[in-house]
Amino acid sequence: MNLNPYLDVAPEVAAAVAAGKPVVALESTIISHGMPYPQNVETALKVEQIIRDNGAVPATIAILGGRLKAGLTAEEIEYLGKKGQDVTKASRRDLAVLVSRKADGATTVTTTMMIAHMAGIQVFATGGIGGVHRG
């Protein structure tokens, strides 16, 4: 499935990518599944500000209404934070279903990397990489 027609890149992110300026992709699962509201939203916005303060453009990535989003507004981050675990934790295998159902998804590391690559973003920061568990 070619997902590029479903990709929305925020104007600020698109301009930075086109100009060769630094852009940092951020996953969104940490917002919906990693912390309780409102700390999740406060932390996400603070991380974006730290990136800005250091001369780069943040691009938090998620799937909203079936659209792959590279760069969220503060309102979209708030939406994900309030919905919390009601939002699908979206891995690679979930993309086609979420897009076809016009559903929401908070992106895991894998999905964030895929969408970031589609948007021309080469740098990615995360709060942690899962998949390794004791017991």
Spans of features found by a protein language model:
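Glycine-rich, flexible loop/turn motifs
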Residues: 9, 13, 31, 76, ...
